[in-house]
Amino acid sequence: MTPTPGEADLTNTPAPRARRSVLSRGSWSETARIAGILRKETVGGAVLLVASAVALVWANSPWAESYFALRDLKIGAEPFGLHLNLTLGTWAADGLLAVFFLVVGLELKREFVAGDLRDPARAALPMAAAVGGMVVPALIFVAVTAPVGDGATRGWAIPTATDIAFAVAVLAVISTHLPAALRTFLLTLAVVDDLLAVTVIAVFYTDEINLTALGLSIVPLALFALCVQRRIRSWWLLLPLGVATWVLMHESGVHATVAGVLLGFTVPVLRSVAAGGPEAGPGLAEHFEHRLRPLSAGVAVPVFAFFAAGVAIGGVSGLTRALSDPITLGIILGLVVGKPVGIFLTTRVLTAVTRANLDDALRWIDVFGVALLAGIGFTVSLLIGDLAYGLGSDRDDFVKVGVLTGSLVAALIAAVLLRVRNRHYRAVWLQETADTDRDGVPDVYQSQRD
């Protein structure tokens, strides 16, 4: 029928495009994988908290001297002129944390090759949010410490890191049923945070470089890469190559934990065609991650925390002095205010710019709660504090007080916010776990089954 004058012809009017949703639920395979990672990190987080508490109590007990004597005990040698006569605290920071960063490297590569970060549309939000969560706390720290002078701003990167083990331990304590999309967002944020942290450590906290040692480190790294590309799993071969890479990287002046990330990057995520292709099963990266994550979360990080978290507070007067220092204040404000505000505002702005909608199951208060969890910076923050001001220095002690206080405050505020929303989270969780046909895949993922 021909429309009369004044009437619009609606027959050929295109339907309005549906707005894209951000922080929506991912695939079942990715959700299940992330749930498994977070379960392991929860146990690691509990061990981390215990190790930190023991260090704090010991460092402020009548036996404090024995704690610091143990931390500063030198073990090692200097074969072939290599500087490997290190204190236990340094072995923990440079050596054990290399295992942690090896797992980070494996996780990063998997995310970029087969995880959420392989899709530019899905990767843009957490990557931008992580950058925002790095820039804002760094600016706050610099603004607070700049008037002090004397290199106080050197620790600008301290409040920029997220400790995923600590964060998921908080979630376990408050017993919240965080939706899968928020868990994925938190883990992806932490993964990108770790990538940024490694970059910052390598670029900004390397004073002098021994180019010969750095060049030589490429040899065992390349041999390691050759072996894993050929799917060689023999630890009697891979371990010496990994250790040699670490030793030469340490000797070069670049922080040795960078070696862990580079080794992780060389491991293939997907099976080659010769090995049966991607459908033949998990790649070597997943195999290594499965073996190494318990060692990283249950041993490497807690031992580092034990040696890094011990600070002699000196009673009420000492605590007051530490809390009034600009370095401590800059860290606390960076973690509690800068980190969540940076993540939240970046997420909000990017959502508005791309004309997307927040997923129907979520509210912006949920995003802010997760952003507060990202303000729990512990392991990497303490490591950067050691690099910025020197292990055992007065400023390093202020760093420890700031990181511990800021992380605790961020955790408490996040716990309150997320706990208030827990009834809604539980309803979402029941929907996400309902499996009426008992085939092992929840009903909401049936259309995405892969």
Curated annotation (Swiss-Prot):
Gene Ontology terms: cellular component: plasma membrane
Entry annotated with the keyword Transmembrane helix: yes
Residues annotated as transmembrane: 43-63, 86-106, 124-144, 155-175, 185-205, 208-228, 234-254, 258-278, 299-319, 326-346, 364-384, 398-418
Gene Ontology MF term list: sodium:proton antiporter activity
Catalytic activity field: Na(+)(in) + 2 H(+)(out) = Na(+)(out) + 2 H(+)(in)
Keywords: Antiport, Cell membrane, Ion transport, Membrane, Sodium, Sodium transport, Transmembrane, Transmembrane helix, Transport
Organism superkingdom: Bacteria
InterPro entries, alphabetized: Na/H_antiporter_dom_sf, NhaA
Keyword DNA damage annotated: no
Pfam families: Na_H_antiport_1
Bilayer disposition of the protein: Multi-pass membrane protein
Coiled-coil annotated residue ranges, if any: none
Subcellular location, record wording: Cell membrane
GO terms (BP aspect): regulation of pH
HAMAP family found in the cross-reference section: NhaA (MF_01844)
Role this protein plays: Na(+)/H(+) antiporter that extrudes sodium in exchange for external protons.
Membership in a protein family: Belongs to the NhaA Na(+)/H(+) (TC 2.A.33) antiporter family.
Protein name: Na(+)/H(+) antiporter NhaA 2
Organism in which the protein naturally occurs: Mycobacterium sp. (strain KMS)
Gene from which the chain derives: nhaA2
